[in-house]
Amino acid sequence: MADFWATSLGQTLILLAQGLGIIAFVMIGLLLLVWGDRKIWAAVQMRKGPNVVGAFGLLQSVADAAKYVFKEIVVPAGVDKPVYFLAPMLSLVLALLAWVVVPFNEGWVMADINVAVLFVFAVSSLEVYGVIMGGWASNSKYPFLGSLRSAAQMISYEVSMGLIIVGVIISTGSMNLSAIVEAQRGDFGLLNWYWLPHLPMVALFFISALAETNRPPFDLPEAESELVAGFMVEYSSTPYLLFMAGEYIAVWLMCALTSVLFFGGWLSPIPGVPDGVLWMVAKMAAVFFVFAMVKAIVPRYRYDQLMRIGWKVFLPLSLAWVVVVAFLAKFEVLGGFWARWSIGA
C-alpha cells in the first residue's frame, strides 16, 4: 500500500484530497465569517442579528447561499456575456488558489514552496482582473467606476504591503511561510513573534489589508451611498454570490497571512502548551474580529483621502521601515530578531 502512494496516481490522489480539504476549510470558514460579521455588527448596534435559522443563527449563511443559488439570473441587455460570467468565477478561483501555500501546522501545507510570499502576492494581484472584467462587461457606468476605483486602490496598497513583508523576509531570510513561522519559535512564547520587533508595521499591514480586500472603511469600489453596489450592481443570483464569496475568502486569507507573518502561525503563545492548528485558527478568528469591529465603528473614507493615505503616508513609512530593518540586520545592532540574516553575507 505504501508503494501505491509513492506512484504518480497516489501522489495525484493525495494532492486532490489536500485540495478538497483546503476548499472545505475555507468554505466552512466563509459561512462562519459571514455569520460572525453580521453578529458583531448587530452587537455594536444593539441588535440580535441572525438568530432564527439554526442555533444562534449559525445556519443563516447557508440559507442565504441557497436563496442566491435558486434565484433567477437576470442578465442586463448589452452585456458582454462571456466576460460577464467569467469575472465572478475568476474572482473565486483566484481567492481559493492562494491558500495552497498557507501552512496551518507543521507540515500541514499543500505546496511548501520557497517563494510562497511571492505566490500569494502574485495571485492576489490577479484578483483585480475579476473586478475590472465584471465592471467593464456590465455595460453600465456605476460598475465601471467601481471597478476603476478597485484597480487603483488594490495597486496602491499592494505596494505598501509588499514593502512591509520585505521587512519580515529580511528578519527571517526566507520567503517560505513555514520558515517564517519557525523563525518566530522561542522560549518566550508570544514575545518571540514578529509583532514585537515589527510593531510599527503591524498596524500598517492590517490597514493595507482592509484596503486590499475592499473592507470598510475602504469599501469605495462598492460604496452603497455613491455607487449602489459598485462593480456588482448588474449582478444577481449565483454570480453575485461568487463575487461575495471571493471577497470574504480574500479577507480570510489576509487573516491567515497576518497570523503567519506577525503572530507565530500555529505556535502556542504560552510556553509549555503544545502548538497546533487550533492556535492558527484562533489567531485568524481574532484578526477577523478586528476586521468586523472596524467595519462596524469606522466611517468610510473619501476616495481622495484613501489614495492620499496610501501614497503619501503608508508608502514612505513602509519604505523607511525596510531601510531600518536592513540596517539592523546588516550590522546586527540589536541581535536576536535582527541577526537572523546578515545581508550580503
From Swiss-Prot:
GO BP terms in the entry: aerobic respiration
Membrane topology: Multi-pass membrane protein
Location (main, coarse): membrane
Gene Ontology molecular function terms on file: NADH dehydrogenase activity; oxidoreductase activity, acting on NAD(P)H, quinone or similar compound as acceptor; quinone binding
Highest rank taxon of the organism: Bacteria
Its job: NDH-1 shuttles electrons from NADH, via FMN and iron-sulfur (Fe-S) centers, to quinones in the respiratory chain. The immediate electron acceptor for the enzyme in this species is believed to be ubiquinone. Couples the redox reaction to proton translocation (for every two electrons transferred, four hydrogen ions are translocated across the cytoplasmic membrane), and thus conserves the redox energy in a proton gradient. This subunit may bind ubiquinone.
Quaternary state and interactors: NDH-1 is composed of 14 different subunits. Subunits NuoA, H, J, K, L, M, N constitute the membrane sector of the complex.
Protein name, entry field: NADH-quinone oxidoreductase subunit H
Native source organism of the sequence: Rhodobacter capsulatus
